[in-house]
């Protein structure tokens, strides 16, 4: 699982697992700092279930020799444009600026490019996007430069604001994405993270997968309903400090969406990415068999 909202939604299940309270299912959790650490583990078959960026799930599905299904959406939009100052009131104000970001080749890059392009800003020419390998480096860049602008996900927005009172949220990428993607039924949700599993594991252990999904949904509900208690667990697992987690959890869009609802939301999101850059989803949109327990 990825360090961030994904891992935060999983903490109650991790705690139950450590206390031997997960019934017949036994778990071995690993928290990774970036998706690059997770991909080879799935490809090599070392991991049965993984929480990954939404587009990476599609890339893996399209990869030869990798057979995966998506079990659930676990994180909606968590990206924000933050700045050290007060110069960004709209997307148009980003023109000519340097934006620090991480997540090149994943949801953050595509969401940023989509938002800029929809507002008439060319990501290649009209702004300078400096990609860092980890979110913490963007937080450091914000602290070091008085007029810096960064794109950060929660909980790192809260981390940055805790470290520097001059940092403010300028734009919510989820709102900007929805504005850009149309009205009413055509509006596509910005999806950050999903849970996938190897198909050979699903076929060999169908009951264990169903139990996992029930326990994971319960964990997500616990985290959203018991923020203070969940924040302590987030701190215990060294994801972010408990006091940061307590402020961040309500902003993290931690969710559990499965079945047909997952398929509807995720397929429309991947469709937008595909239009923008087919490589973002692995060159082709996944077939129906990608979506676990969906018609």
PLM features per residue range, with description:
Residues 123-127, 238-250, 280-287:
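Short, surface-exposed acidic
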